[in-house]
Amino acid sequence: MDWTWKNPLPEEGRKISFVGKGGSAKSTTLAHLVRYWKAMGIPAVAHDADDSDGPEEPGSLLAWAEMLPVHSDGLGAPVYRAPAAPSLRAEMDRLRPPHGLSLVDTKAWDRGKHNSHLAAIRASDLLVLALYPSGMEKWRGASILGAMDEVESMSGHRPRVVCLLTRFKKGVGAAGEVRKELENEGLYVLKAEIPANESKTGYSQSFGTVPRLKANSDMHELAKELLVEATR
C-alpha cells in the first residue's frame, strides 16, 4: 500500500502534547501514531516527560524505543527524555523538524506547578486529552480546562484541546454517553477512538514491539485526523 499522505503542516510544523490519567493509553497511542506518521511521510520527534518512576528512570515511551532492535527504524521517530519544565517549549522548538511534529508524552494528569503539565500546555499548539469513557472523565475535562485558563491568564497562550476516547470495549454504550457529556460541556471529541484490544497483536500487548501498520485501522484514522486538527 502507498501510505503517502499530503503533508498539511506549515514549514514551522506543530507541537502536540498528550495528557490524561495514568493508564489512559497515552504512550501506547503515541508509539503507534509516530509509526503511522513515518509511513505517511510526516517527520516527527517525541519527548518523554513521564518521570513518574523518578527523574533517572525512563518513561514508558522512551523505554519502549530503547527496547527495539538497533537495526530497525524503531518507532519511526527519535524519542528524547524531556528536559525540566521551564525548558520544554524551547526544546520542542529546537528539535521540531520542518513541516513536522514535536510531540510530548506526559505522566498521569496532575496540575501541580512543578511538573510538566502546565509546561506542556504552554508549549503546545494542540493538546490531546486521552480519556477512558467513565463518569469521572467529565470531571477530568473540567480540570484540564481550568489549567488552560490558568496558563492563558499567565502567558496569553491557549492551545486547541481535543478529547480522545481510549481503552473501552466496542459495543458498550458508555463511550457514546461520555462523548455526549463532553460535547455538551463544549469540548471537542475526536471522531477516531482507540478501543481496548487485549489480543496478542492488539494495542494493549504491543509494548516493546515495533507497532504494526494496518490501513484504515483506528490508529490510522487517528493519525490522519490529528494532522487535520493540528492545522486548524
Identify the function of each model-found stretch.
Residues 40-61:
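Short beta-strand-centered segment that lines the nucleotide-binding/catalytic pocket of NTP-utilizing
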Residues 48, 95-117:
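Switch II (G3) loop of P-loop NTPases
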Residues 55-80:
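N-terminal beta-loop-helix "entrance" segment that forms/cooperates
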Residues 114-135:
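Inter-motif core of Ras-like GTPase G domains
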Residues 139-159, 166-167:
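Conserved C-terminal guanine-recognition region of P-loop GTPase G domains, centered on the G4
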Residues 167-209:
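Beta-strand-loop-alpha "switch" segments that mediate conformational coupling across diverse proteins
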Residues 202-222:
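C-terminal boundary of histidine-terminating zinc-finger modules
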